Amino acid sequence: MGEIININITSIIDHIVFILLLALMLIIGVLLKLENISIKDLFKNKEALFIVILVIGLSISSAIFISFMTNIPLKQSIMISSGLGWYSLSVVLNTDFIGEYYGMITFMVDFLREVLVIVMVPLLRRYLSVELVGYAANTAMDFCLPVIRNNYGNKIVPLAITIGLILTIITPALLVLENIIL
């Protein structure tokens, strides 16, 4: 049923999404160049590093709390929260590591994180800025970046890209390590 004229629709959609993400990354690179911001400067951003540590710590702490308040096992709860918005990766890894049921929950948690950022940034922009960029996690540098930029201006773009980039590098390792350790 997923095939039309012997072509897998999922494969085509995956390729289109991949090409769109590459185009978005190219646009981000061009914008950084126009703002005279180097990649080296991004990784020297101490505020971004602090936010990354805070996001990971609070995600894991929340997962521990939720595990004790519900019947979700600790390992599954921590791994669900550690997707950090990257649902195309975390769902696949968590489905392999902790099962299809928790893989689907991972998708919902990561997807809702993205939707909440898109809805909450315009509503709370007067009261919160870097907090919502941190909550966007991996999506701060791609899908949520236009919403963040439109509401907070170009000055916050390097911070958002740095947070997203660092979390994008850390997330796969975090999920694999949690699966091994827990």
Set out the residue ranges of the language-model regions:
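Helical membrane-embedded segments and adjacent short helical loop/helix-boundary regions
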Residues: 1-59, 74-85
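Short alpha-helical packing/oligomerization segments
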Residues: 4-8, 14, 124-131, 135
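Short helix-capping/hinge motifs at transmembrane helix termini and TM-loop junctions
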Residues: 6, 70-71, 125, 179
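Hydrophobic transmembrane alpha-helices of multi-pass small-molecule transporters
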Residues: 22, 117-118, 144, 172
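Entry/N-cap segments of selected transmembrane alpha helices
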Residues: 38-64, 103-115, 159-167
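Alpha-helical membrane segments and immediately flanking helix-loop junctions
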Residues: 76-116, 127-162
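Juxtamembrane boundary at the C-terminal end of a transmembrane helix
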Residues: 173-182
